[in-house]
Amino acid sequence: SIAAALTASFRHRETRKIYWAAVAGVPHPRNGTIKFGLVKAFGHGARGEGEKMYCVHPKDMETTEGAKRATTDYATLAQAGKRTCWMALIPVTGRTHQLRAHMAEIGHPIVGDGKYGGSGQENMGDGWGAQLGGDISKKLHLHARSLTLEHPVTKARLNLTAPLPDHMARTWDTFQWAPSDVPADPFEEDWR
């Protein structure tokens, strides 16, 4: 069936998902791969509400119960000084909160991510969010930008692109970041 073919395509990682995010600071190097494993810490609610993923160093994977391998590719597309930048992210593995946990682990949490440390816009002191203030929404700045997959019947390559949500579009306007200024797939060799 078509549904089974699509499910298999996702399971076998034959799809390509690119996310866009605004993050605190600017990573160095500007492009790279994050290979920290993830382990789940359950929340305090009756149904485990508030669960959070914690990163596990690759050397500790074998000795950390419940740890699962996780890999994220990232590329810096633009920046606003040293305070924030526009990232493209590919979850090579598809773990819960993977992108959010990985970006926080390397010191560049996603803007608006209260769970993983990216809610610093309110910091009026020396935090990354100082001087950004009310112009930037406190909502999570993570967006599933594109999905590329093979059509299950015709086998043609499909590229699906979603526009930025309103709160992120306002942020992009504030920083004068234009989606038309970057390639659809910044991970292609000729762009990097």
Q: Positions of the model-derived regions?
A:
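RNA pseudouridine synthases
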Residues: 1-192
